């Protein structure tokens, strides 16, 4: 049985002694939705119509889908729904950034809209909390609760689009880029992140260029090696340290997949990817007198000498009880200059939304069950969240 058929069988199976649960059509890619319509005895092209209604027009009410006959609309209402996360809290920054706390079940995740002169980027979460325990990141301090479903991931894009007027309202810049850089490690939720990204790329849905959809990872190497077999999108690596000793400390997944192992995997991805222009983005948070010295810049240049890349230097954004300080502008500028002398393209990222805790590393959300991280430690050892990915 093919993956789509297996998925549909799972979605359509109902226990005889339990009420039927409606299928959330946002959990389905267009191909899976075509299988769904076949199961209903309908023509598969109806899926194309539904996907357009949901994502092109932002419609979640079957009755408003005027090119679908009433009989089919009634059938759909009986077995399916279109449901995206609702906004629990909205905060607007003085710089135009908007942060939403999106309600997903009993928990919340955070989604950030960042408008700029030539683009508008949406930062999307992939998990409730995060299990990787990066010491400089607010989300990691909240612990891990669960993976988000496809509908909870793509639903963030849908809800944000609905709010900002991405469905044809003039005067508002639409979402041009999506970055999987919100709460969570995307490569620990590949089963749901990849289908959500497929919907982002689908011309019947959002039709984003694969160069405008970016997946950021701290380095789950087996999943990264598999990613190119599933989808081609832009790649960003959360490196943050130029040597294993330091990275073991601040990005604990490095204890399982060290820098060389990670960079080798990145190079393999670049060799087969068309989405990256032959270059990967390296993310490097600047921590005062921790990883921002001249010696660190030289070490980083050595690590990346055979990897075509653009380096983003990220001024660290503080959160309560964090054991770090933000690097001074002088130290950041000196770090940048040193790397540029090696010929690297190095950009100092402008901090956006820090007045509403929407900046990089500040997303925390409302993680209710904080015991999951402890359970993962017991199951997988101290290398939290570095389980094998088949």
From Swiss-Prot:
Residue pairs linked by disulfide bridges in the UniProt entry: 123-360
Subcellular localization: Cytoplasm
CDD domains reported in the protein's UniProt record: Radical_SAM (cd01335)
Span of domain Radical SAM core: 116-355
Organism superkingdom: Bacteria
Catalytic activity: adenosine(2503) in 23S rRNA + 2 reduced [2Fe-2S]-[ferredoxin] + 2 S-adenosyl-L-methionine = 2-methyladenosine(2503) in 23S rRNA + 5'-deoxyadenosine + L-methionine + 2 oxidized [2Fe-2S]-[ferredoxin] + S-adenosyl-L-homocysteine; adenosine(37) in tRNA + 2 reduced [2Fe-2S]-[ferredoxin] + 2 S-adenosyl-L-methionine = 2-methyladenosine(37) in tRNA + 5'-deoxyadenosine + L-methionine + 2 oxidized [2Fe-2S]-[ferredoxin] + S-adenosyl-L-homocysteine
EC number: 2.1.1.192
Residues forming the catalytic site: 110 (proton acceptor), 360 (s-methylcysteine intermediate)
An example Gene Ontology CC term for this record: cytoplasm
Primary site of residence: cytoplasm
Positions with a binding annotation for S-adenosyl-L-methionine: 184-185, 216, 238-240, 317
GO BP terms in the entry: rRNA base methylation; tRNA methylation
GO molecular function, one term: metal ion binding
Keywords tagged on the record: 4Fe-4S, Cytoplasm, Disulfide bond, Iron, Iron-sulfur, Metal-binding, Methyltransferase, rRNA processing, S-adenosyl-L-methionine, Transferase, tRNA processing
Binding site for [4Fe-4S] cluster: 130, 134, 137
Short name of one Pfam family: Radical_SAM
Protein function: Specifically methylates position 2 of adenine 2503 in 23S rRNA and position 2 of adenine 37 in tRNAs. m2A2503 modification seems to play a crucial role in the proofreading step occurring at the peptidyl transferase center and thus would serve to optimize ribosomal fidelity.
Protein name listed in UniProt: Dual-specificity RNA methyltransferase RlmN
Organism of origin: Haemophilus influenzae (strain 86-028NP)
Gene: rlmN
């Amino acid at each position: 049985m093919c993956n789509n058929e297996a998925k549909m069988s799972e979605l359509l199976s109902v226990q005889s002694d339990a009420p039927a649960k409606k299928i959330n059509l946002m959990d389905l890619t267009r191909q899976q939705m075509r299988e769904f319509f076949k199961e209903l005895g309908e023509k598969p092209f109806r899926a194309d119509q539904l996907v357009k209604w949901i994502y092109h027009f932002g419609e979640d009410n079957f009755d408003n889908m005027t090119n679908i006959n009433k009989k089919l609309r009634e059938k759909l209402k009986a077995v399916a729904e279109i449901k995206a996360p609702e906004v629990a809290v909205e905060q607007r920054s003085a710089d135009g950034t908007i942060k939403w706390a999106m309600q997903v079940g009993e928990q919340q995740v955070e989604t950030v809209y960042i408008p700029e002169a030539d683009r508008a980027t949406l930062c999307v979460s992939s998990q409730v909390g995060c299990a990787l325990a990066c010491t400089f990141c607010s989300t990691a301090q909240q612990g891990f609760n669960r993976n988000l479903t496809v509908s909870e991931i793509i639903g963030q894009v849908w809800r944000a689009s609905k709010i900002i007027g991405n469905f044809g309202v003039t005067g508002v810049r639409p979402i041009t880029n999506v970055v999987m850089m919100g709460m969570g490690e995307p490569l620990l939720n590949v089963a749901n992140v990849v289908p959500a990204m497929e919907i982002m790329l689908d011309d019947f849905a959002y039709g984003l260029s694969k160069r405008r959809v970016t997946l950021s990872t701290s380095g789950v190497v087996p999943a990264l090696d598999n990613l190119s077999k599933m989808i081609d999108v832009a790649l960003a690596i959360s490196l943050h340290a130029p040597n294993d000793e330091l990275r073991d400390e601040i990005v604990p997944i490095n204890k399982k997949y060290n820098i060389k192992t990670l960079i080798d995997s990145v190079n393999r991805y670049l060799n087969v990817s068309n989405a990256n222009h032959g270059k990967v983005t390296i993310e490097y948070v600047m921590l005062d007198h921790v990883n921002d010295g001249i010696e660190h810049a030289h070490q980083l240049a050595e690590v990346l000498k055979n990897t075509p890349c653009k380096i983003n230097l990220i001024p660290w954004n503080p959160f309560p009880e964090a054991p770090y300080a933000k690097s001074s502008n002088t130290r950041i500028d000196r770090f940048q200059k040193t790397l540029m002398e090696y010929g690297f393209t190095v950009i100092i990222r402008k901090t956006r939304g820090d007045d509403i805790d929407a900046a990089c590393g500040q997303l925390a959300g409302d993680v209710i069950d904080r015991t999951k991280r402890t359970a993962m430690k017991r199951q997988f050892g101290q290398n939290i969240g570095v389980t094998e990915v088949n």
